[in-house]
Amino acid sequence: MSEEIITPVYCTGVSAQVQKQRARELGLGRHENAIKYLGQDYEQLRVRCLQSGTLFRDEAFPPVPQSLGYKDLGPNSSKTYGIKWKRPTELLSNPQFIVDGATRTDICQGALGDCWLLAAIASLTLNDTLLHRVVPHGQSFQNGYAGIFHFQLWQFGEWVDVVVDDLLPIKDGKLVFVHSAEGNEFWSALLEKAYAKVNGSYEALSGGSTSEGFEDFTGGVTEWYELRKAPSDLYQIILKALERGSLLGCSIDISSVLDMEAITFKKLVKGHAYSVTGAKQVNYRGQMVSLIRMRNPWGEVEWTGAWSDSSSEWNNVDPYERDQLRVKMEDGEFWMSFRDFMREFTRLEICNLTPDALKSRTIRKWNTTLYEGTWRRGSTAGGCRNYPATFWVNPQFKIRLDETDDPDDYGDRESGCSFVLALMQKHRRRERRFGRDMETIGFAVYEVPPELAGQPAVHLKRDFFLANASRARSEQFINLREVSTRFRLPPGEYVVVPSTFEPNKEGDFVLRFFSEKSAGTAELDDQIQANLPDEQVLSEEEIDENFKALFRQLAGEDMETSVKELRTILNRIISKHKDLRTKGFSLESCRSMVNLMDRDGNGKLGLVEFNILWNRIRNYLSIFRKFDLDKSGSMSAYEMRMAIESAGFKLNKKLYELIITRYSEPDLAVDFDNFVCCLVRLETMFRFFKTLDTDLDGVVTFDLFKWLQLTMFA
């Protein structure tokens, strides 16, 4: 069979955002209606290949060196020398997608440090319903084979259907990355390829937390337990989690890079992700012993301590029970006592498939809300609470807790409202090839004081955070994809502030909120409005004679200034203010000033118009100096936000992002001329809108001529 190369169509920028919003409104992104990743439709592509007698070749993730990686697995790396891309049908006469159902032994790690992902896949095989959500039925290398397969993954709040071809990296006739123990099953290798595709390359999968894989296969939320500080009923929590079908993983922390994947005396691997696949209590010499079953994704290197495959403890267990539990083959799976587990391992991750009864004994439906947000330099990336001058500009979200938990759950404890916050940064693995990795992220929770409770959604300002301490916060700021914490707080209103640790670190994020009882949530943002002064009415007689003489000297005998003359006048005046950092006013900015002030439409400013403009600029200069807090002659982007409000404008965070992009320098400084240009532009646009909004409903309708007139000449 020949190969058919099918190139996907990409949408970018505003077009992509509009399409995404429309898709959500149509219900796309839920598991039963997954979004076609990169617009690739599995059925359409498969049918096309079958009709043309060709095998699918995916140009969105082509079989080329760049798909392997960018550094350690980059095109010039010795590790990728000799790698070829082949289909399973070229390797075996009778390859299989899945044989007798997916099992944990189908997943053996190859030459890639993605044990965290493989541990998650291994846990996935314990639940057929979950597995077949991720690995759809009906795929094979026999009936209807066209070299194309598909998988469904949860990506930052949406389910996506990811198409891949079956060209896999091969070296010396063997799969380079994940493979099955028998060597003839390929579902796990193709799932790994789909995951590599959404993250940009195979190398992007190196190193991570099992919780990432858990969540991307389920859409669930992960809880972390540091085993040195674990609750006394952790074993019961594990049993309940396994009963619910939750996915569990664990690892041993390392103290230095040299410890990475070091093997302990009893054959445990440090810095390596294991999956927890079972838990059972057995009668051992008349006492009940709690056991836990683990699996190493390598498919080998197993625990050799008590309760390992060949240990003597099994001789003192009822033969029937022993045969049910005991694992004899070298497949990476083993039992150990829970006591040894607590002693040897450092961290446990439990991904709850739905946010039901987290750490609770009774299962009930939790309420869920998801928000998307961004951190942008100069506008919404304020850093953590250690940076009080900028912390307040971070995105803010309000939670209203009304109902307390049922008393059955907590006995005599003080009543409160339980909820989980989970902050996840987006697309960081995909951006590794550009030198960007996980940012250090976290969040703080503030109680809204009674005098501010119930007010409309207003972004809280710097003074609030200077005067109020956080009521709760994430357990730590850490450079993981997601930070999640469970809280119990009294009823009331709270504000959540997600942030990076340092200011000016850019990124996109998803904030998920899970509450046991009904709760109100909202994103806080200022409503767009302007407190514009009435347009000044002034006669020439009211203007000071000295100002008239100065204007005559600058403007000439016609007593009018053109755009060029205005630029000359303003730059001559502003150059005398040595304390200001400025490059001078541009023709474009002076044209905006003329458009704002020109009453008779001749494109020039007369004496009265110039006098009004000059008084306005003097007011802007006063505001500029007030908010140039360090007296550097320029404002920071964050200082500019306060200055704009002082000038009478309230804008939402999206507009601030646009303004900072347009009017700040690369170092995020805003000089005086750019500040004036921004305020003039804002006033012009607000006044245009006010003129057109005749019924004062905040909505205007443009025909094409009006739109062009507004955008081209405002």
Swiss-Prot record:
Amino acids binding Ca(2+) 4: 628, 630, 632, 634, 639
Upper classification of the organism: Eukaryota, Metazoa, Chordata, Craniata, Vertebrata
Protein task: Calcium-regulated non-lysosomal thiol-protease which catalyzes limited proteolysis of substrates involved in cytoskeletal remodeling and signal transduction. Proteolytically cleaves CTBP1. Cleaves and activates caspase-7 (CASP7).
Assembly notes: Forms a heterodimer with a small (regulatory) subunit CAPNS1.
Species assigned in the record: Pongo abelii
Residues at which Ca(2+) 1 binds: 109, 114
Domain EF-hand as annotated: residue spans: 541-576, 585-618, 615-650, 680-714
Compartments reported by the entry: Cytoplasm; Cell membrane
Binding of Ca(2+) 2, residues: 316, 318, 323
Name of the protein this chain belongs to: Calpain-1 catalytic subunit
Cofactor names: Ca(2+)
Domain of life of the native organism: Eukaryota
Activity regulation, short description: Activated by micromolar concentrations of calcium and inhibited by calpastatin.
Domain Calpain catalytic: 55-354
